[in-house]
Amino acid sequence: KSGKNYMMMGTSVYTYQCLYVKSLIDQGKLGKIQYLRGTHFQDMEGWPDYWKGLPPLHYATHAISPLLFLSGQRASRVHCFGSGTMREELVRNYGNPYPVETAVFRLEDGRTSADVTRSLFETAHEYVEGFSVFGDKMSFEWNFENDAPYVYTFEEGMTETNIGNRGRVISRQEVHCPNREEILPEAIRKYTTEFAILDPDNPDMYMKQGGGHHGSHPHLVNEFVSSIIEEREPMIDVYTAADWTAAGICGHESAMKNGEEVVIPEFR
């Protein structure tokens, strides 16, 4: 109760992709959300020592936050399993034996579930930060960092079926998510995409700016500064930040208990 504003700089809920899906949900195009899935694969070899052997779900907000943000819920319970083995040097730091963890979360409505898979070490995969949201009218799937996402839509009418009358016809469409610069002050709109700043004294030298984490940075800055000016809580306030972080912490606790259910604390 300091009277100050605190905001978690959660890049994953302000990416092109997440803002696009939020728009689909707000327009009712996805319909009823049935299931959500998040992934984050990243090899952390060579990073500072405090990363070595970190439990995967202790740094899982990139995979968890879009799911909770888009569902408008917090996670209430979790079952999680760890997978694989790591060299002893990595296990020693945190007592964590797992390079990969997969969690299934029950959301607070008691009906919706979400799963998250996170890896940090000794797993041969390119960098991936992606999520999927499955609705009863339309679904969105983004599986690979630099690939375009897709939407899947039921054709109109419950009687539209595939050959043999089994299963409804579903269309698949590649989507290109807009950067939503129009909702930002004009002065910072350019930072949603990458551009080069040239050094006039060294024409061959330049520095890349903007576009980080799929255009999220200016949206985060705008939300935080606006919350101060407007004297309100920011979108990712302390309680939301705690919800997103605790989900991963409790997920790892479940993994260390061989998948036992762990109840996630409520902080409000």
Could you say what each language-model-derived stretch is?
Residues 4, 31, 253-268:
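C-terminal capping/lid region of NAD(P)-dependent oxidoreductase domains
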Residues 1-49, 53-56:
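A contiguous active-site-proximal alpha/beta segment in oxidoreductase catalytic domains
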Residues 58-179, 208-210, 217-234, 249-252, ...:
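Contiguous beta-strand/loop segments that form the cofactor/metal-binding neighborhood of enzyme cores
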Residues 186-220:
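Alpha-helix-centered segments that form part of catalytic cores
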Residues 236-238:
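Conserved alpha/beta-hydrolase "acid-adjacent" motif
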